[in-house]
Curated annotation (Swiss-Prot):
It is found in: Cytoplasm. This is Holo-[acyl-carrier-protein] synthase. Belongs to the P-Pant transferase superfamily. AcpS family. Transmembrane segments: none annotated. Mg(2+) binds at residues 8, 57. Its EC number is 2.7.8.7. HAMAP family: AcpS. It catalyses: apo-[ACP] + CoA = holo-[ACP] + adenosine 3',5'-bisphosphate + H(+).
Length: 145
C-alpha cells in the first residue's frame, strides 16, 4: 500500500546561483558527502545538485513533514544502486518518521525517480508499505530505507 507520495520541481538556475554565491557552504548544508562527491564529479554539476535537491523536497513531502518536525536536508541522501537506479539512504529524523509511517507487519520501500531538462529538475517519491510477516518479529530499529 502507498503510505506517502511527494513531487518537486527545481529551477537549475537557482542552484547555479546558490553554488556561485555560497559554494561549499550551500553544498555542505544540504547534501551528504556521497551526494557532493557524485555531483562535483559531473559535467552537469548544477543539474546533478538540482535533481538531488528536488528529491529531498519530494521525500520530505512523502514523509508528510516537509523540512520540519525533525527532518533535515542531510538525513535524506540520494544514493545510486549498482544498476544506477537512484534511491534514498535515510537517517536521523527522516528514518524515524519512515518507521512511524510504516504499519506493523510491513516493511517500507522508498521509490525515487529523478530527471532534468534544463532549466528544470524534477523528482517523484513514493513510499510503499510491503507486507512482511518477519517485520512483526523485528524491533523497529532494523528498518532500512
Amino acid at each position: 500500500m502507498i503510505i506517502g507520495f511527494g513531487v518537486d520541481i527545481c529551477d537549475i538556475r537557482r542552484i547555479e546561483d546558490s553554488l556561485a554565491r555560497f559554494g561549499e557552504r550551500f553544498t555542505q548544508r544540504c547534501f551528504t558527502e556521497i551526494e557532493r562527491a557524485k555531483s562535483d564529479g559531473r559535467a552537469g554539476r548544477a543539474a546533478s545538485y538540482a535533481k538531488r535537491f528536488a528529491a529531498k523536497e519530494a521525500c520530505s513531502k512523502a514523509l508528510g513533514t516537509g523540512l520540519r518536525f525533525g527532518v533535515a536536508w542531510r538525513e535524506m541522501g540520494v544514493v545510486n544502486l549498482p544498476s544506477g537506479k537512484p534511491t534514498f539512504s535515510l537517517t536521523g529524523g527522516a528514518l524515524n518518521r519512515l518507521k512511524n509511517l510504516t504499519p506493523l507487519g510491513c516493511r517500507p520501500a522508498v521509490h525515487l525517480s529523478i530527471t532534468d531538462e534544463y532549466p528544470w529538475a524534477q523528482a517523484q517519491v513514493i513510499i510503499e508499505a510491503l507486507e512482511d510477516p518477519d517485520a512483526l518479529l523485528q524491533p523497529p530499529d532494523v528498518f532500512e530505507a
